[in-house]
Amino acid sequence: MKEQKWIHEGLITESLPNGMFRVRLDNEDLILGYVSGRIRRSFIRILPGDRVKIEVSRYDSTRGRIIYRLRNKDSND
């Protein structure tokens, strides 16, 4: 059976080496996020200040996988 995961939204607060980021979730938790392979393959750039969707395991809630970068409402893209 596939492992159950929680999906949260959060804000990238800090960029760390090797594709790792410090993410502040909407519930004010601070966790360590790493970039998923699909985002890495698509060359999607993630910077501090971006809003992301992050998938968190029920067994280790201090780490998560960034699965989607949300569009900023104030950008001109």
UniProtKB/Swiss-Prot annotation:
SUPFAM superfamilies: Nucleic acid-binding proteins. InterPro entries: NA-bd_OB-fold, RNA-binding_domain_S1_IF1, S1_domain, TIF_IF1. One of its GO terms (molecular function) is rRNA binding. Pfam families: eIF-1a. PROSITE patterns: S1_IF1_TYPE (PS50832). Residues 1-71 form the S1-like domain. Keywords: Chloroplast, Initiation factor, Plastid, Protein biosynthesis, RNA-binding, rRNA-binding. It is found in: Plastid, Chloroplast. GO terms for cellular component: chloroplast; cytosol. Belongs to the IF-1 family. Component of the 30S ribosomal translation pre-initiation complex which assembles on the 30S ribosome in the order IF-2 and IF-3, IF-1 and N-formylmethionyl-tRNA(fMet); mRNA recruitment can occur at any time during PIC assembly. One of the essential components for the initiation of protein synthesis. Stabilizes the binding of IF-2 and IF-3 on the 30S subunit to which N-formylmethionyl-tRNA(fMet) subsequently binds. Helps modulate mRNA selection, yielding the 30S pre-initiation complex (PIC). Upon addition of the 50S ribosomal subunit IF-1, IF-2 and IF-3 are released leaving the mature 70S translation initiation complex. This is Translation initiation factor IF-1, chloroplastic. It comes from Nandina domestica. The gene is infA.
